[in-house]
Amino acid sequence: ILSGPDDSRVSGIVRQLQMVDGKMSGYVPGTINRRVVLLADIAWIQTDGNVAVIHLATGEKLESSSRLTELEDTLKDTAFVRTSRQELVNLDHVTGIKPAGSGRMLLSLGEKTLVASRKYASEIKRRIGIV
């Protein structure tokens, strides 16, 4: 596929093709080096300004220019679930869940704990089989 560097249509097509193969790509922060990783290796994704930060289970980070809503749409049939306006979490990496009050939930991913907002709690419960 040939295109200009900012052709969002082609970027979207490439992103969807990678998802079919169970992979996602991102840039190593501060470089132009693109790296392809398995979806299974991604623990969570969060927004940081105009960048989606892909957090790998190893602790490494990659960056993507895709919007979180685009990634959510692309990852809809995978283990990823929206947990807040800023985050998507791979449920395969969740090691514990606790109530956090006001309908929120604490999701443990190894040593990292993320807060799931009340808005997304029911979908998380449904996906893990609590409801």
Annotate each PLM feature:
Residues 1-5:
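Short beta-strand-to-loop capping motifs
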Residues 7-109, 115:
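Conserved binding/recognition cores within well-folded domains
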Residues 129-130:
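…primarily DNA-binding HTH/wHTH and HhH modules…
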